[in-house]
């Protein structure tokens, strides 16, 4: 696909209409299902999400097991989206990311782009400097990247006509414990439920409340 063709794939009105249509669904239809082709496209939207350096120090845990989701619900302020949405995605950040993660990424670049590893040495050193900063700074930096993926997921869902709800209202420590994340080297950051809005979700009728563009966007 050419750059011009890609730019014409989604018309401006289509994008704005989709963003106006979407909202943070508070009540899902428990029987609603996302078509397989749309879900596969949404998974691709996660894989293709941008990250700093392209490092991808994240993982996206799709939880379909109903029993497991029932265990997670009490750790989510008993919000019904956890059990009623067709899909539940837990966005994870890599714990203690370091030089080994950089090397893995460099190896992947070399493989995909057929570039000799030695030609990537400068890039590797730059990334290594970033991941060897104090651990709290590295974790904060990588956590911010996860929110980029969340935004990409939500926009993609809107364009596909798939309902979703981003959620920070959950006990991260409890999630990590229930899902056994720490032992696997991961930490939960944010979650997103996706599915079909319930016909009686009152929030669907609410008008969007946004400040005027003139107050939010400045051109200098």
What do the PLM-derived regions correspond to, one by one?
Residues 1-220:
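Acidic, surface-exposed loops and disordered segments
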